[in-house]
Design a protein with these regions (language model features):
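Positively charged n-region of N-terminal signal peptides that target proteins for export
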Residues: 1-5
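Residue-level hotspots at or immediately adjacent to binding/recognition sites across diverse folds
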Residues: 23-341
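Sec-dependent N-terminal signal peptides
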Residues: 6-11
């Protein structure tokens, strides 16, 4: 009888342990508009709220690359001044205790979160908590600024690099899926491509934005589409390229691609393509250049940040848009990323 009791107790403990190891991905309820918080991060590590008030200066921050959120928590990747590897959570530094084989400078180009895991892109590795996952054939690979996304435990990384199969000296668009490398397709005759934007969802699905030759482009499920521009090529003179996609998202089965195109005065114009149709997003102030930096969907709403630059000075303004309407302007705040809590 005693042995039966011990066996039953051990079995119960085993069930408890197994149950505690099977974590479901957290699902956060969509907050009503009035309860949401928009946070913006600058390259130097200042965190601002939607009203433009300074929330916090990230401690020991040399460079802040990206900000994401999960529920009421926010996470920032970048470069820590003391050379440590990790991230900021709600403004406090968290060190990842990772044993590196290579002595390299640590610069994180992206951050992702799934379940209880934090992913950091620290070339040539992806760090998953304290685990190290080496990117396949990473030589000559150039990551995008926001190069990493995770969906239900599947990790994606984007950028561009050279192809040994077609060694013509031109960059090709690169996608890593769980650290395995592939070059994305381009139209016949195209010579160069770059990936700059990434959105992953439902584990196996991706939308990627960037440029093919001199035109803005999007890859949906790895199939390319060249996006149209407003200004005909013959009016633009000898520009290196016509436009580029910098950020992508999906909302209610519509694909949103934010970036810029050039006009006939050779000015960058902040542009949003919705299902491939371009529209310009300008605040009304006379500016020398503008671009859409980042776009994200929250529930049924779409938020976007644009930046406008004025003349030869360093003056700039960031603008927050909600569903196509300008809702806030930030004077002389340079934004490297934003998120919605």
């Amino acid at each position: 009888m005693r042995y039966l009791f011990v066996y039953a107790l051990l079995a119960a403990c085993a069930v408890t342990l197994l149950s505690s190891c099977e974590h479901d991905e957290p699902v956060n309820p969509i907050k009503p508009l009035e309860d949401r918080t928009v946070l913006l991060v600058t390259p130097s590590g200042e965190i601002y709220d939607q009203n433009g008030d300074l929330v916090q200066q990230l401690p020991n921050c040399t460079f802040a690359a990206e900000i994401i959120s999960d529920g009421d928590d926010y996470f920032v990747s970048g470069v820590q001044s003391k050379g440590r590897v990790g991230y900021w959570k709600n403004g406090k530094w968290n060190t990842l205790h990772v044993d590196f084989i290579d002595d390299v400078d640590h610069w994180t180009y992206g951050i992702g979160k799934w379940d209880y895991y934090i992913y950091l892109l620290d070339i040539p590795n992806v760090l998953k908590n304290s685990g190290i996952f080496r990117l396949e054939d990473f030589h000559d690979f150039v990551p995008a600024q926001h190069a990493l996304a995770v969906s239900e435990g599947k990790c994606y990384v984007i950028g561009y690099g050279f192809s040994d199969i077609d060694p013509d000296g031109h960059y090709k668009p690169v996608l890593y899926t769980n650290y395995k490398k592939e070059f994305l397709p381009m139209p016949e005759g195209a010579t160069e491509g770059e990936c700059h934007a990434l959105y992953a969802y439902d584990r196996d699905h991706t939308i990627i934005g960037g440029i093919i030759d001199d035109m803005p482009a999007v890859w949906v499920e790895k199939q390319y589409e060249i996006y149209p521009v407003t200004y005909p090529r013959e009016t633009l003179g000898n520009l290196n390229f016509i436009g580029r996609v910098e950020s992508v998202t999906k909302c209610n089965d519509h694909i949103y691609a934010a970036g810029f195109e050039f006009n006939y005065d050779n000015k960058m114009i902040a542009t949003l393509w919705i299902d491939g149709v371009p529209s310009h997003y300008l605040s009304g102030w006379e500016c020398s250049n503008s671009q859409a930096l980042e776009i994200l969907a929250y529930g049924d709403d779409v938020y976007m940040i644009t930046t406008e630059y004025y003349g030869a000075t360093d003056e700039s303004r960031a603008h927050l848009w909600l569903n196509g309407k300008l809702i806030k302007t930030y004077n002389n705040i340079q934004v490297s990323g934003f998120t919605v809590l």
